[in-house]
């Protein structure tokens, strides 16, 4: 898999929403021993723990989702076509993002959000407003 400094190295990445991202990051790092890897404003952060990664996000108003999952894949468009053929509920089609990823999102029958992501470029987080703490 192509390396991208803007993304955690893990293949499966849980995303947990909180009302106060900074407070959650401080608590998770202090209490569980996570390390802050990347900060994006006050609304998103990536944390590391050994070989694992976790994304802390700002909770969306009216959101019923308690968590979501990001899965990194090698061939996003092929993966998307497979999912699309199964009549899954696609909430956003594949798109390229300034942080070097091509992603699409699906909602599963339980209402959980799954974002599938493929690295398309190694992007320095500074170029889009991120602060990288570890590489």
Question: What kind of feature is each model-predicted range?
Answer:
Residues 32-35, 86-91:
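A common structural junction motif
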Residues 38-39, 44, 62, 98-99, ...:
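A short acidic/small-residue loop/turn micro-motif
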Residues 11-19, 45-48, 61-86, 102-107:
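Vicinal oxygen chelate
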Residues 1-25, 67-69, 117-135:
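N-terminal beta-strand motif that seeds the catalytic metal site of vicinal oxygen chelate
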Residues 8-11, 15-54, 60:
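Core segments of cupin and vicinal oxygen chelate
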Residues 27-30, 82, 110:
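Structural preference for long, well-ordered alpha-helical segments within the folded cores
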Residues 51, 109-110:
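Residue-level recognition of short loop/turn positions
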């Amino acid at each position: 898999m192509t390396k991208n400094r803007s993304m955690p190295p893990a293949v499966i990445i849980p995303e947990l929403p909180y009302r106060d991202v900074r407070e959650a990051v401080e608590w998770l790092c202090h209490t569980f021993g996570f390390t802050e890897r990347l900060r994006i404003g006050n609304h998103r952060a990536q944390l590391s723990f050994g070989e694992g990664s976790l994304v802390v996000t700002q909770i969306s108003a009216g959101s019923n989702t308690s968590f979501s999952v990001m899965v990194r894949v090698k061939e996003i468009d092929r993966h998307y076509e497979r999912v699309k053929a199964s009549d899954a509920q696609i909430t956003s089609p594949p798109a390229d993002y300034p942080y070097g990823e091509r992603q699409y999102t699906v909602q599963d029958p339980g209402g959980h959000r799954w974002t599938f992501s493929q690295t398309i470029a190694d992007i320095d987080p500074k170029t889009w407003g991120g602060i990288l703490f570890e590489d």
